[in-house]
Amino acid sequence: DLPWRRAECSTWGVMVSEFMLQQTPVKRVLPVWEEWMRRWPTPKDLAAEESAEAVRAWGRLGYPRRAQRLHAAAQAIVLEHHGDVPGTYEQLLALPGVGSYTAAAITSFAFGRRATVIDTNIRRVHARAISGKGLPNKSLNAAETRLAEALMPTDEQASCLWNAATMELGALVCTAKSPTCNICPIRHLCAWVAAGKPEAEYTPQGQSWHGTDRQLRGAMMAVLREAHHP
């Protein structure tokens, strides 16, 4: 029962969550999202703030450029859309920091419109259930996109439920390393299970941290968070 999936959540709240959830677990996002929505409940509120304050409030979510891009997107929404999050995929895609996945996710989850959402969890479910592979390809390709579009229900409401359900199935059940196939509702239809769960063609590698630019940025962000002024 995530707050950004509730019916009463604003379109802006959904947009903020999609920025924060990029490469960051839900449990880390939740408290930061709640604080952001308390401080900046509308794009206009964030747009009026200094960019450095947005970065500082990003906390330990990592990849702080997302905060800068979200701030820039808020300013664009105020200047170009009268302060309202735009409701079409094309308009969303034109905002700073919004790529194809984020635009599709906001279209589906915030506006209830049909859009093909393809994240890592959804790709993994498709790879196993339909293609019989242990893991999807390392990068999204045209064949995967066509498959996702073909599987998507044509009805708008059903398509939104499909996106959310498939994403949740991949996040909670059909996980990368320890899938719990015994409780999976589609295990009897799964091509990967039927094939005997063949090994994936590669092993997922975690991102290194020590000695990287990300570690340096993290240290700098810690200093910035303690500062009283940008």
Where are these predicted regions, by residue range?
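Catalytic cores of DNA base-excision repair glycosylases
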Residues: 1-214, 223-229
